[in-house]
Amino acid sequence: VLFRSKTLNIHPVKAEKDDTDLALGVEQAIQKGYTEIDIYGATGGRLDHFMGTLQILFKSDYIKKEIIIKVIDKQNEIMLLNTGTHQLHKSDKYQYVSLILVNGEVILSLSGFKYNLNHQHLEIGSTLTISNEVNRSMAIIEVEKGQVLQMRSRDLE
């Protein structure tokens, strides 16, 4: 967890505990009043830890408080989109946008994309919303029902 300050207090925790180091760090950042948190270095290595990182995005307290948490690496940026309207600016860094269904059914509308959708009903297992592209200065994602993981990505050169 990266804090925007000149000093960083490190609080060691026991190796054997009921949460991951990252989950504890995110909780501490939120307790300090941060409402936007960028997480770096959490996508490589063990898949169980990566999946645990994604679970943090779904914590109901964070959703209720509208905490924005992004998981970022050299090729991707992942964040949770809940029901509502979301603006997405075209990016020179990330060419592709994928919307991953994570639970139940989703109803999506997309505008400003290469492949737009209008009140599209989707269920788990669908790959319809993989590898889209923003083709205007700003695109709109309307999550009418459900939740999706928004993944912005780029090919490595």
PLM feature segments, named:
Residues 5-7:
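Short, structured coil segments at secondary-structure junctions
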Residues 11-31:
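Short phosphate-binding loop-to-helix
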Residues 35:
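Short acidic/polar active-site loop segments enriched in Thr and Asp
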Residues 44-60:
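Short Gly/Thr/Asp-enriched flexible loops that form oxyanion-binding sites at enzyme active sites
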Residues 61-78:
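Short, acidic/small-residue loops that bind anionic groups at enzyme active sites
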Residues 76, 81-157:
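Long, charged alpha-helical interface segments
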